[in-house]
From Swiss-Prot:
GO molecular function: carbonate dehydratase activity; zinc ion binding
Domain comment, as recorded: The Gly-Xaa-Asn repeat domain binds calcium.
Function: Acts as a negative regulator for calcification in the shells of mollusks. May function both as a calcium concentrator and as a carbonic anhydrase required for production of carbonate ions, which are assembled to CaCO(3) at mineralization sites. Is important for shell formation in both the calcitic prismatic layer and the aragonitic nacreous layer. Shows inhibitory activity of crystal formation when present in free state but, when attached to the insoluble matrix, may regulate the form and size of aragonite crystal.
Sequence repeat feature ranges: 162-164, 165-167, 168-170, 171-173, 174-176, 177-179, 180-182, 183-185, 186-188, 189-191, 192-194, 195-197, 198-200, 201-203, 204-206, 207-209, 210-212, 213-215, 216-218, 219-221, 222-224, 225-227, 228-230, 231-233, 234-236, 237-238, 240-242
Start-end of Low complexity biased regions: 157-241
Superkingdom field: Eukaryota
Region annotation 27 X 3 AA approximate tandem repeats of G-X-N: where it falls in the sequence: 162-242
Catalysed reaction equations from the record: hydrogencarbonate + H(+) = CO2 + H2O
Stated name of the protein: Nacrein-like protein C1
Binding-site positions, substrate: 307-308
Region annotation Disordered: where it falls in the sequence: 138-249
Length: 340
C-alpha cells in the first residue's frame, strides 16, 4: 500500500531503466481545476488533450495524462506522502497517468525481471517539493493572476532568459549561464561551473570541482557508477551522492509557482466544498513544469497503490530522487483552500 518510506541503500540499481519522457514533448495542456476528493485541487486536461508518458521497457501500453495535484501535510517538515530514509519534504506533486482504453494496446505489468500476469491501471510520477523565498519575485497581483489563469505565460519561463547571461541561469536548454558564456545549468551546455566538461553537461565526464562528477549522464563515476552511493567513496566521499544536494540540482520552478499561487488563491477554488466541484480556469501546463531537468530524472520505482480512495493497487510509482523548489507562498495558498 502506498505511500512508503523508500530506503535508498536497499534500492537495487538497474542501468536499463528508461528516462522519463513525454509524448509530445513540452506540450502545453489546457486544464481546469477540480476538487480532489476534498484533499487538494487538481489540474485535469480538457477534452481532446492527449499527452502520454514514455517509459519504454518499464511499462507497455499507452498511459494518458489524467491530472496534476499537490499534497501537503499539517507541518512543513512532514508534508510529502513518500519519504526517503525517513526524510519528508513540505509537499509532493503527483502527475497521474491512466491507461488509455481507447488504444489497441493492452498494458502488461512489467516486473524488473520480466513481465507477469496483470496490468497497471496507473502510472504516477511523484516529485518532492521544497519551499523557498529567494528567486521567486514578488507575490503575483490580481492582474497577473488574471493573465495567467487565462492560459498566458510569463515572458521568462524555464526555457527562457536567466539572471545575467544571454540564455539564462535556469534555462533548461540554455547555453549560457549565470555570468558566463558556457552555462551553469544549460541542459546541453558543454562547459560547467569550474571545469572544462561541465557540471551539468549531459555527456560531461567531469563534475563540479573534480575529475569524476556525479551529474554527467554518461560520466564515469556518477551516482550509480563505480563510486556511487554504496561504493568505496560513498555518500559523502569525493565521488559520492552528496557532491551537490544529493547529486542533484534543485530546480526553482518559478513559472509553476506563479500558476499554483494564482490558482489556489482564486476565490472559487478556495471555497471548494463538494467532491467533484470544478472551476474552469484556463490554465496551461506542461508535465515538465514540476519535474527536475531531464538529466536529473533519476528515480525510484515500485508497484503500489493510489494514496486516496479507492486506493487501487495497480499503480506503477516513479518517485523522483531530485527535488524541485516552489515558492513558500504556494504552500500557504494551498493550506488556505477550504476543505483541505
Amino acid at each position: 500500500q502506498s505511500p512508503i518510506n523508500i530506503v535508498s541503500y536497499d534500492a537495487k540499481f538497474l542501468r536499463r531503466l528508461p528516462k522519463l519522457k513525454f509524448k509530445p514533448h513540452m506540450e502545453k495542456l489546457k486544464t481546469e481545476v477540480t476538487n480532489h476528493q476534498n484533499r487538494a485541487p487538481e489540474f485535469e486536461p480538457e477534452d481532446g488533450e492527449n499527452l502520454y508518458v514514455k517509459l519504454n521497457n518499464l511499462v507497455d501500453g499507452h498511459y494518458k495524462f489524467h491530472n496534476l495535484h499537490v499534497h501537503n501535510g499539517r507541518t512543513r517538515r512532514k508534508g510529502s506522502e513518500h519519504s526517503v530514509n525517513g526524510h519528508f519534504t513540505p509537499m509532493e506533486a503527483h502527475l497521474v497517468f491512466h491507461h488509455d482504453e481507447q488504444t489497441h494496446f493492452e498494458p502488461t505489468r512489467t516486473k524488473l525481471g520480466g513481465a507477469f500476469p496483470g496490468h497497471n491501471d496507473f502510472v504516477v510520477v511523484g516529485v518532492f517539493l521544497e519551499v523557498g523565498d529567494d528567486g521567486f519575485g514578488d507575490e503575483p497581483d490580481d492582474e497577473e493572476c488574471k493573465h495567467i489563469l487565462k492560459g498566458h505565460h510569463p515572458d521568462n519561463n524555464e526555457n527562457g532568459n536567466g539572471d545575467n547571461g544571454n540564455n539564462g541561469y535556469n534555462g533548461d536548454n540554455g547555453n549560457n549561464g549565470d555570468n558566463g558564456n558556457n552555462g551553469y545549468n544549460g541542459d546541453n551546455g558543454n562547459n560547467g561551473v569550474n571545469g572544462n566538461n561541465g557540471y551539468n553537461g549531459d555527456n560531461g565526464n567531469n563534475g563540479d570541482n573534480g575529475n569524476n562528477g556525479y551529474n554527467g549522464d554518461n560520466g564515469n563515476n556518477g551516482d550509480n557508477g563505480n563510486n556511487g552511493e554504496n561504493g568505496n567513496n560513498g555518500e559523502n566521499g569525493n565521488n559520492g551522492e552528496n557532491g551537490h544536494k544529493h547529486g542533484c540540482r534543485v530546480k526553482k520552478a518559478k513559472h509553476l509557482s506563479r500558476i499554483l499561487e494564482c490558482a489556489y488563491r482564486n476565490d472559487k477554488v478556495r471555497e471548494f466544498k463538494k467532491v467533484g466541484e470544478e472551476e474552469g480556469l484556463d490554465v496551461h501546463l506542461t508535465p515538465e513544469m514540476p519535474l527536475p531537468p531531464l538529466k536529473y530524472r533519476h528515480y525510484y520505482t515500485y508497484e503500489g497503490s493510489l494514496t486516496t480512495p479507492p486506493c487501487t493497487e495497480s499503480v506503477l510509482w516513479v518517485v523522483q530522487k531530485c527535488h524541485v523548489q516552489v515558492s513558500r507562498r504556494v504552500l500557504h495558498a494551498l493550506r488556505n483552500v477550504e476543505g483541505y
